[in-house]
Curated annotation (Swiss-Prot):
Cellular component per GO, a single term: cytoplasm
SUPFAM superfamilies reported for this sequence: Class II aaRS and biotin synthetases, tRNA-binding arm
Taxon lineage: Bacteria, Bacillati, Cyanobacteriota, Cyanophyceae, Acaryochloridales
UniProt-recorded name of the protein: Serine--tRNA ligase
Xref: InterPro entries: aa-tRNA-synt_IIb, aa-tRNA-synth_II, aa-tRNA-synth_II/BPL/LPL, Ser-tRNA-ligase_type_1, Ser-tRNA-synth_1_N, SerRS_1_N_sf, SerRS_core, tRNA-bd_arm
EC number(s) stated in the UniProt entry for this protein: 6.1.1.11
Statement: the UniProt record of this protein carries the keyword Ligase: yes
Binding partners and assembly: Homodimer. The tRNA molecule binds across the dimer.
Chief localization: cytoplasm
Keywords: Aminoacyl-tRNA synthetase, ATP-binding, Cytoplasm, Ligase, Nucleotide-binding, Protein biosynthesis
UniProt catalytic activity: tRNA(Ser) + L-serine + ATP = L-seryl-tRNA(Ser) + AMP + diphosphate + H(+); tRNA(Sec) + L-serine + ATP = L-seryl-tRNA(Sec) + AMP + diphosphate + H(+)
Amino acid sequence: MIDLKQLRENPQAFGDRLRRRGGDFDLDRILELDAQQRQLEQQRSQLQARSNEIGALVGKKIKSGIAPTDPEIQALKAEANALKQKLSDLEPQERQLKEELESLLLTIPNPPSETTPIGRDETDNVEVRRWGEEYKPTYPCQPHWDIGTRLGLWDVERSVKVAQSRFVTLLGLGAALERALIQFMLDSHRERGYVEVLPPLLVNTASLTGTGQLPKFAEESFRCADDDLWLIPTAEVPVTNLYRDEILAADQLPIYHCAYTPCFRREAGSYGKDTRGLIRLHQFNKVELVKFVHPETSAAEHEALVADAEFILQALKLPYRVIELCTGDLGFAAMKCYDLEVWLPAAGCYREISSCSNFGDFQARRAKIRFKGAKHKGTQFVHTLNGSGLAVGRTMAAILENYQQPDGTVRVPEVLQPYLKCSHIGGAKS
């Protein structure tokens, strides 16, 4: 959620920064509702103060020996009753204003950071760096969906029978490779200081609202018909909300968590895109990295988060590039974001495999995650960050394509061989 105080104090500058995303946002209506709400709060405060004053005055007069039936006492009590009615009459007005204001605030995205490149869409994103040499074999290069089918790593047709399209059942070494990747990613992140979490796969509406998926992306999520529960689109949601409505001690920060979960997305707007393979599924596995940090270290923690995701790609020796998203391509809740894109030789292009976002205090305001330190009076909102470390299915796709051999086998990356107990998939060595 945006900082309403910032908008109130400098609406022009705030609006200019927000409009770098593109689109039109009704900030004037928010300011109007905010002013009305503050006016009602002031009115309530004045009425309550007078009510308290009358209560004290009546008590003092009765204590001095004046009878409760005295006309002066009766007049004060009548005024007190009138004030009580006025306070009661304010409640529905305040409630309606609060609901409308909060509803509007939930639709406003996070303003981009000052260092985010300005642009309209993904064509204006900025390449930051590349790692590794693009694999371009001299022999015919198969796409991962053909490799996986040929080697018996999954069964798509039966998955459609069991569920529908965009689901896959992994088999044999396909299932083993997926499991090996998950374990390797978790082991690596734990060694780098992350505390592993195994969270619920179903969350309530408040959790999805806290991280920014609701109300904007309700159509992208799977919802249980009879309960206030949703299947998670990413582990970011349950892990971030572990600390919802909490005040942390400053010395608890930073908090680093890693989590493996299946993720579920309807992909409502992707009809006809990536219909084959592991790139775009309704259910997929992902290892997520989530950080809760002090605002002063937020930018440095973001760069470190990107490095942690890059570590997995480098350990697997998969070529990739780092892209900084422009203002027009930022996710709803992010103020700054880097995408890691892995090289897929069959397609001859890079595809996103991790998105590492700094949300500033945007999610923390929605989820009410604060901290209290000795140097500051009151509480402050933490900064939250998260990134994929990595999307497991897309990592498998990249391995199958980048490690395919002329004899039709797939060489297993060295770091995964202890997990799989083999050096190749397919052929005599598997």
